[in-house]
Amino acid sequence: MYPAFTVAEVRRAEQLELDRLGEDVLMRRAARGLATVVLEELRRSAGRVYGNRVLLVVGSGNNGGDGLWAGVTLARRGVRVSAWRTGSAVHAAGWAAFLAAGGRELDAAGALAELSRAAVVVDAVTGLGGRAGLRPEVAGFAAACATRRVPVVAVDLPSGIPADPPFVVPAPAHFPATTTVSFGGRKLCQAIEPARSACGRLVLVDIGLGTMTPEVVCWEPADVLAHWPVPGPSDDKYSRGVVGIDAGSASYPGAGVLATTGAVRAGAGMVRFVGVPEVAATVVERLPNVVAAPGRVQSLVLGSGWGRRPDGARIVAAAIDGGLPVVLDADALTLLPEVLHADVLLTPHAGELARLLDVPREQITADPVAAARQAVAQTGATVLLKGASQVVATPGHEAVELAVPGPAWTAQAGSGDLLAGICGALLAAGLPVRLAAVLAASAQALAAARQGGVPPQELDLQAALG
């Protein structure tokens, strides 16, 4: 797992070091790390360092200073370095050192002309305080970088992308980072979509900041392997966990099949299908190891593909009152009682959560972490917000967790039904709700990634999981 931090938290940690060491020490550390990455990029993309051209695009703040001091190091290594100052001001000491090292100043027109010869562009325009979008002149240059496919190394973050949410969809004008060099730790824009993809390859540079409190904790594939429940030699089907599933309807029978398949392939010891008879017949035909009869269970999955269910509210209320961990998906999310608890797992996508919170859908996608937290505060339940970044928020836990990211191919009908079943299986195995949610979303993402660059069908995902 790795943490990601807000701008405020990074600045707090930076200020402690600035007070202790001064600005120059931190900036030189950052510049050395940045120069190392640019040199690596030159070797990778151009095959050599000496004599190649690097174009710095620098703003007025410390971000620009980092770029200029890195330019000094590059010039001393034989790189032909030029710089375009995008504003009226510039970091004075860095600019003087850059010129003294043989760096060349360009205006906007000169920078565009130099772009055809540059092996690497360093984006040092804005830093942590940057807003979404770029001034027209800079936006035009950034677009030219994308058109000409010049490698771009961004300093801390791609200019035009804010460090903290909200993240606008589609993204405003920004530099197309091939690589982003982040100082002191990951920022939220480097962990949460759609900003994450705009950052390209991420390289972390340690500049000696102290302990910081993360806003989100991001899961990695190794974490899934470490936490996945594995049966022991004395386990049987009951001790592995029995999950009860009521999903699907005459109009949407496939939802029942998919939710049940997810639970089976995720390793449930037994799956009881307790939904409507017309769906039960289809489920048992596809999955003969499923028991289509009521009985004791350790978790419940409700709502996927229900449509309008006259007895739905009663079923949901009874499940919540029963004290078992419950997954509420899709149509069950419209039938919530006033009182929920942390063992209830809500699995909305952005549209469903927008309706639940009575806010525009765009507000959910722009800041999924805040949206998931708001849902927890409003309902008292644990929330798995599905989407490009899958967010798990839990009552009593300050940090939000992000599942392992997966390919965009998983954005297809049926993914949520499948995920609900996986969640149910992990809950039946005895995992805490928070852990089951992030494990399930991560496992689905990893299974999709194994399918390669083609649109996976949901049963293919389950074949990969199995």
Regions found by a protein language model. Give the residues of each.
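Small-residue (G/A/S/T)-rich helix-start motifs and N-terminal tracts that mark the onset
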Residues: M1-R85, T179, G185-A330, T334-L345, ...
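Generic hydrophobic alpha-helical membrane-segment signal
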Residues: Y2, V90, D107, A111, ...
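Nucleotide and nucleotide-moiety/phosphate-recognizing core
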Residues: T36-V125, G133-V155, I315
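Short strand->helix junction
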Residues: S88, L128-R131, P162, V168, ...
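Short, conserved loop/turn and helix-capping segments at secondary-structure boundaries
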Residues: A92, A139, A171-H174, A366, ...
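A short, aliphatic-rich alpha-helical micro-motif
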Residues: L115-A119, H174, P294-G295, I320
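Internal gly/pro-rich beta-alpha loop/helix module
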Residues: A119-V120, V125-V216
